[in-house]
Amino acid sequence: MLSMKEAIENYVEGCVGKVDCPAYKLFMKAILAGMMIAFGAAGSSVAAHDIANVGIARLVAGVVFPMGLMMVVMTGAELFTGDCLAIMATVQKKHTALKLIRMLIVVYLGNLLGSLMLTCIDYVSGQYNYSSGILGAYTIKVALGKCNLDFTTALASGILCNILVCAAVMLAA
């Protein structure tokens, strides 16, 4: 097992290859990651949508959702939230800030496209009609809840999520 210092050194060295990767390769890996995270989200909704106890439903969803992140880490796909950690290599002058920004934009757009692609496939597959439409209603309820968060709450939740994703990426380094 690597020490934290060794894990950081490994990750920083790996970032050099990431930022220099051709845009089309980054984009394809990012589409894949977006789909995998969407699989995790869809799986957590399927697992939790028909559980009456809110606490248990959230626990089940919380256990299933990280499967998407595990797929991303194991396949080497590119996820925006984890790639934000590449700023460590920028600070150490392993690459320029411009290269980091280019990578983050390409990965963000690829993640968005991948998640939208999987959402469309889920819709066409009829998945949202499961349980007499209860899964679709649950999905809408979750989406509305997230859309109605005030800016500060959404930002704080996003930061906390990013900390957890970066921790997972470092553990995998």
Annotate each PLM feature.
Residues 1-173:
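Alpha-helical transmembrane segments and their helix-helix packing motifs
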